[in-house]
């Protein structure tokens, strides 16, 4: 469920969404725009992308707490791309089976 047959990585799309949200964009608007732009994604990929982006956003505080328990660099000091990659990874490990 990472790269589909059109060469689009759903995890990269989720990361892009999370970075836009951090820049102040509304989560539902960014997600809708991405889903419209990549409407050829399979139903399974769209569901995965939605769950990963929404779940990571909803549990951001908890995910940062977990990351901070194991990282020498606190999440607020990390580069946004690194912080959001780690958030996605922890969310997938803790809440998803993929």
Q: In which residue ranges do the predicted regions lie?
A:
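Class I Rossmann-like S-adenosyl-L-methionine
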Residues: 1-98
